[in-house]
Amino acid sequence: MAQVAKKILVTCALPYANGSIHLGHMLEHIQADIWVRFQRMRGNQVHFICADDAHGTPIMLKAQQMGIEPEQMIAEMSQEHQQDFAGFAISYDNYHSTHSDENRELSSLIYGRLKANGYIKNRTISQLYDPEKGMFLPDRFVKGTCPKCKAPEQYGDNCEVCGATYSPTELIDPKSAVSGATPVMRESEHFFFDLPAFSDMLQAWTRSGALQEQVANKMQEWFDSGLQQWDITRDAPYFGFEVPDAPGKYFYVWLDAPIGYMGAFKNLCDKRGDLDFDEFWGKDAKTDLYHFIGKDIVYFHSLFWPAMLEGSNFRKPTNLFVHGYVTVNGAKMSKSRGTFIKAGTYLKYLDADCLRYYYAAKLSSRIDDIDLNLEDFVQRVNADIVNKVVNLASRNAGFINKRFAGQLADQLADPVLYKTFTDAATSIADAYNNRESGKAIREIMALADVANRYVDEQAPWVVAKQEGHDADLHAICSMGINLFRVLMTYLKPVLPSLTERTEAFLNTELTWDSIEQPLLGHSITAFKALFNRIDLDKVNEMVASSKEDMAPATRVTGPLADDPIQETISFDDFAKVDMRIALIQQAEFVEGSDKLLKLTLELGGETRQIFSGIRSAYPDPKALEGRMTVMVANLAPRKMRFGVSEGMVMTAGPGGSDIFLLSPDSGAQPGMQVK
């Protein structure tokens, strides 16, 4: 009995409409597109949607800086985003915006239902207010000195140096990041979503299979620490949707942003007329709903979003598919190094299929970060796509075209070998379906090695010179072309542009169900180059064109200018600080934090655990193990969300990827005092 086609709705996280798409963004859109293309090849009905996240204070302020209205800015940004996604062959059925009539109506509907069901609470809160701009300041628009480690220029929600979290009112010497003014405290009534009311439902949903194990474990930490009511409103001025019957109050961007998934699909339904919105979003929907997201927005998608849907009588997602971050050459993307590469810049220099293949080869169902090593990128694409796959076609097509008028043989030279290739369809399909594209690629390339070994052993270039062996030559080369066809069918979800050229060359569509039947007595077209090798010089040009001079042209820069020397202290004050040499025994990531590393330090007879905000500069923590460093040993232990930090390691630098762990001269031993 034929398998019943599934009805599936797939979304990617909505790109924020205040900046360009870069190669970090593209990981998610490529991963989702590969999965969608595979599902379509298997006969499932997939609707693939996305939209720009177009609301919030950052967009309002950036538009002001540009001297244009927010509506104009987000329209221009949407056009750029859609052009980039089209350039990478992301097969969206609809790309919309959260600043839309559909989203306004759905946001108001969901809010109204939540309010009617008793899940909206009113509370007066105190907030920092910019007296010059006449606006309340979100956390990220306040900067000051960290109340924990005293690091300057930290945002109002957490410290990028020590990893501490706090409220903006706890900052020392806070300043508005908008105007530079000293903010004042003002009270305002806000509306809160009663998230704790959904704790039992969320805990059951967490363990229902809707989340990866890593995500479910992280959520358990949030449950253990207790859920809090969620502030869903912001005060004017704000670019977004005004709350019904509450003049001057606006929905917080994270309320209407996920509703944008629904708005984009509603817009598609209205365009097509053959889709039923409720079939995919109704409370008892039997269709599948999948969200591809990055690990940085798990909190919103795994807690607030399903709770909002439950409380407003809509269905919850079938699954969240969470991925990690992208690093380039082992480090965080950097504008100064040219590794912060925009999607549009990439497309000026390289084929989109190259990046699609490289990401596919590295992706799995886990939340691990992926490193785009540019030298490895060049080597892998050239070795796999050009040397193994495309070369298989070029080695055989010439003989078929010249000696046999483009006609393939009527019989397979090696039916057993061909069956080996088609038998792999099940395991490769399982890998794609489970988002293990890296596993699928490894299996496909292993088959490519077998195919090339077959051609090497049969040596058609030798057979071509032997009289009376035309039938053998015909059979060998036809076998090679058929193996190439199977490989390209397996690679079709990953390489859409190469697939299109391949289908034109083979004069047939590549479908999963047709590979059981080889191409026999079939006419192919004249072979043309299907894929070009990557030139490392092109990659270097791309990097060079992505470099930005990060230094402001109008002021003197340097460590002292950026970070002035603090006021003078007495020797007695300094003597209170006990700094010691420490050996880093172990360094590891902290699950749930994209800024912290957990360090186990040995001080010569004593072991300490420290959480340090240096992850952005040291993406491979294992490289720190065995290294000597300097730590403040008599700092009071500090309880953090992830455990107790028993000191602080000494670093230099402004932050981000420019953090430098201090090390002693050779000969220093763990436990020695730094004087």
From Swiss-Prot:
Gene3D superfamilies: HUPs, Isoleucyl-tRNA Synthetase, Domain 1, Methionyl-tRNA synthetase, Zn-domain, Nucleic acid-binding proteins. A motif ('KMSKS' region) lies at residues 332-336. It comes from Yersinia pseudotuberculosis serotype I (strain IP32953). Binds 1 zinc ion per subunit. It is found in: Cytoplasm. Belongs to the class-I aminoacyl-tRNA synthetase family. MetG type 1 subfamily. This is Methionine--tRNA ligase. Zn(2+) binds at residues 146, 149, 159, 162. The lineage of its organism: Bacteria, Pseudomonadati, Pseudomonadota, Gammaproteobacteria, Enterobacterales. It catalyses: tRNA(Met) + L-methionine + ATP = L-methionyl-tRNA(Met) + AMP + diphosphate. Its cofactor is Zn(2+). Homodimer. HAMAP family: Met_tRNA_synth_type1.
